[in-house]
């Protein structure tokens, strides 16, 4: 016999799923500001990224595995279409981050910006470390996307930085086998032409220069959709309890480049392929070229 608590829990779960369905189904009917408010509210309805992902999956009837004949066309070469290097494209240049940070991480951000304003800035990718996810979304390099029924590859030009999204029905690896990874472990499902992704098992990092830190407890939920012939849009919710007071929602977008002559290519390159000396971190927390010299002094 069901207890009152069990029935209440079940009703609450159904209510949240229904609310999720309503919010997601109405987002395209709203102006951008109202849409963002609704999507932020959706994130706050769910305690964890896993909870939001599960609700979206239930709303989609469990999701589906696409056949090769029904795959969306994401071919081409893309670039981030707005936002500069701000993690939230709606953040105006010089304005505070739109993330609601815990006091400790707010202080970290303020120090990072103050240091940068004084010329003291360190970026892990200066020594060719991968940007990692969720920073991956903001990197200003060309991107390419390969979609198959069982997995989707999200490819960033720098060092062939690839996110692998498994859509064959598998779950995340068992908790006992997890450890932090730059791009984490990503599973997903298709809801019509929308790819819904949950990523966990991430390493700590920064969203971008002059942007906040994230911890190795960070997790994300993304909804990718091609909204017209040349635009891929992504709704992103970031959950990171040590750093964020509430989930951070942003909308990312990537524009397909004109390539009528088929000459555009994604090419492997890394930050060591330049004429500069090796970059090192200074004692003061900034960056400097090791043994830096201007030009060839005294050489041929």
What are these regions (language model features)?
Residues 2-5, 23-27:
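Conserved, well-structured beta-alpha core segment at the onset of a catalytic domain
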Residues 2-15:
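Bacterial N-terminal signal peptides that target proteins for export
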Residues 15-16, 27:
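Cleavable N-terminal signal peptides
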Residues 16-22:
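Sec-dependent, cleavable N-terminal signal peptides
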Residues 25-300:
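PEST-like low-complexity, intrinsically disordered acidic/proline/serine-rich tracts
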